[in-house]
């Protein structure tokens, strides 16, 4: 029997507001524990919540960017549960009347475009953070009350790879809107995944498991891959899939049982009595719509049609707003479009991955990268020298030409000096001369390599090719 995988994702995104969802306390990351709180966050008796209008604006902006319908009337509800990092013993959320509904995004997997539906986007407040160790627990309520949006996909995702592509695209869109930085390492983007299997051709969904502790997109994919295999083996062996919550164990790549999954009835939702329903008229909607900036698909189209980049390059460059903004900044400084694209996707990305940092953690600027690329373009700096200059530029900033000079890496363009390297290479490799004369193209490349090696990569490659051909024709 063959099974079809059915996946739905619930993504929580922290909004980048200055204050919290229902209180004036600061909502910034990284403050001293329990310093960003006030009487509303701590659930003192008699205090009342006040809705953060900026958070509503940004929830609407995100909804519109995700092609959603904005509800004219929505309301807040109480989701009741007890946990130490939830002082009120309930969370203010939206249950049956969310701010946004019926959206979609288009993803690309294996060269195919697929539309993934989005059921809803609703607003809620975040809980605090509990840390458990050595038999005791610590609670930090700085995060308590931080504005969240929860984005719930339709069960349209059919593989872990599609789930990964969906998350990449969703993060990209939200980052471009400016409502969140979507940093998983800081908790400003979190994902829970629901997965079930059903026999091919069956309309009815199977029993789902919810996966938690998915701290990166890679872990989302790996957790779903393991769970897909686990459920398939269970069903093929005649077993039963239980509705349960499981956590992904990063150390062994497996999912482990946390608890039997609760349903919405267990939370005893009821309308929040301290907050009136939210009414959004057309004027408010239009005002928010005008604030939506250029989104990744629009930039991708521009890069292909205006800049002439391949679709793959355009896709990679627009995945994150910081990379796309950096690319546009460098091009605006006069850097060649394709060279800039190649460097950002190649040398820059390799450096970032190797050091496990973001572009904004470096000393790179569009200006200094453009300066280096223009030196490569006009022949002042070879690609080999650029690879030696770039780490210094990324770590300390400055001017690429000055770094090149300080390191003694100035490209050799003096013909007399280059001719010495050329003739030395020819004298030491007579067989290569014969191979060249017999039409073997690799011989030329070998000789160029010998010259570049002898000059420690500082020979001007264009001049080397010109002089080498000239000298070969004489022999």
From Swiss-Prot:
First-level EC class: ligase
Function: Allows the formation of correctly charged Asn-tRNA(Asn) or Gln-tRNA(Gln) through the transamidation of misacylated Asp-tRNA(Asn) or Glu-tRNA(Gln) in organisms which lack either or both of asparaginyl-tRNA or glutaminyl-tRNA synthetases. The reaction takes place in the presence of glutamine and ATP through an activated phospho-Asp-tRNA(Asn) or phospho-Glu-tRNA(Gln).
Gene: gatB
GO biological process, alphabetically ordered: glutaminyl-tRNAGln biosynthesis via transamidation; translation
This protein's name: Aspartyl/glutamyl-tRNA(Asn/Gln) amidotransferase subunit B
Keyword DNA damage: no
Pfam families the record matches: GatB_N (PF02934), GatB_Yqey (PF02637)
Reaction catalyzed: L-glutamyl-tRNA(Gln) + L-glutamine + ATP + H2O = L-glutaminyl-tRNA(Gln) + L-glutamate + ADP + phosphate + H(+); L-aspartyl-tRNA(Asn) + L-glutamine + ATP + H2O = L-asparaginyl-tRNA(Asn) + L-glutamate + ADP + phosphate + 2 H(+)
Self-association state and partner proteins as the record states: Heterotrimer of A, B and C subunits.
HAMAP family: GatB
Record's keyword annotation contains Cell membrane: no
EC code: 6.3.5.-
Source organism of this protein record: Staphylococcus saprophyticus subsp. saprophyticus (strain ATCC 15305 / DSM 20229 / NCIMB 8711 / NCTC 7292 / S-41)
